[in-house]
Amino acid sequence: EISLGLVGSEMCIRDRNGWFHYAKLYAATAGCIGFMMLKYKWSIGKTEWFKVFPFLIVAINILIAVCSDFESAIKGGINGGWWFSNEGVWLYGGWWNWLNGIAGLINIFCMTGWWGIYSSKKQDDMLWPDMTIWFIVAYDIWNFTYTYNNLPTHTWYCGVALLLAPTFANALWNKGGWIQNRANTLAIWCMFAQVFPLFQVDGIFATLPCLLYTSPSPRDRG
């Protein structure tokens, strides 16, 4: 745990590594490895049945965020809105988390054509042609909404820059390679965030993650 905080007259900022960041780190890394197996045709990456892997790992990544959204909705409902997450951040949960979680589930069912995944001629990319610009835009909007609601301390990094990087690459010079670029940038960010956690709360685009309220002592009340 890394903490700087507001207790009494002192400012308190807490940043903890909760379940979400670890789940995303391992899921994104698994995706990168699986995509390389398909791209370079390593071992089972040569087989036809392994083409279902990108769909499964992307679905798992989406479900991780969906579970986090539902967690915020439930705990926000129980606590009257505000609740203190295991990331050390005050979040405001409500019906919007339910809606965004459902949108994530719809995203999963909108992924098609995974049997058409193939490696480029020079094996530079794993290409998924059915990942159209419309799906990518819908995914980006859903994912940004998730980060805005649940990762407020670093939404600029993981919710804007991290989403736009593979989207621009797909639109301008790397058509069909969006999902592999998304996995690579996400895994790199997750590793960086774990090694340098204070960057998320002390960077130029960071926001104040928490203000802890402590009730006054009997001496103060007297």
Q: Positions of the model-derived regions?
A:
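Short, aromatic-rich membrane-interface segments at the entry and exit
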Residues: 20-23, 154-157, 180-181
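Single conserved hydrophobic/aromatic residue that forms the stacking wall/gate
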Residues: 1-8, 13, 213-222
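Non-cytosolic membrane-interface motifs at loop->transmembrane helix junctions
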Residues: 20, 93, 209-212
